[in-house]
Amino acid sequence: MKASELREKDVTALQAELGERLKERFNLRIQQATGQLARPDQLRKVRRDIARVKTVLNEKTAGKA
């Protein structure tokens, strides 16, 4: 997901997106721990998506404060 796509969303949509990504990361970490993770690069991709969402969320909340 691109940051430009995230900037078009509102704060509630970004928070929902963050929740989804955190759940996805949790599931991938469980798969990794049990040796079932077929593509380890997915974990890195989700981690970076979480960072992008958090960055855009902080930009939006800092703009309102």
UniProtKB/Swiss-Prot annotation:
Keyword Ribosomal protein included in the entry's annotation: yes
Record GO terms (molecular function): structural constituent of ribosome
Alphabetical list of InterPro entries matching this protein: Ribosomal_protein_uL29, Ribosomal_uL29, Ribosomal_uL29_sf
One GO cellular component term noted in the UniProt record for this chain: cytosolic large ribosomal subunit
Single Gene Ontology BP annotation: translation
Keywords: Ribonucleoprotein, Ribosomal protein
Gene3D superfamilies in alphabetical order: 1.10.287.310
Pfam families (alphabetical): Ribosomal_L29
HAMAP family: Ribosomal_uL29
Entry's family note: Belongs to the universal ribosomal protein uL29 family.
UniProt protein name: Large ribosomal subunit protein uL29
Organism of this sequence: Alkalilimnicola ehrlichii (strain ATCC BAA-1101 / DSM 17681 / MLHE-1)
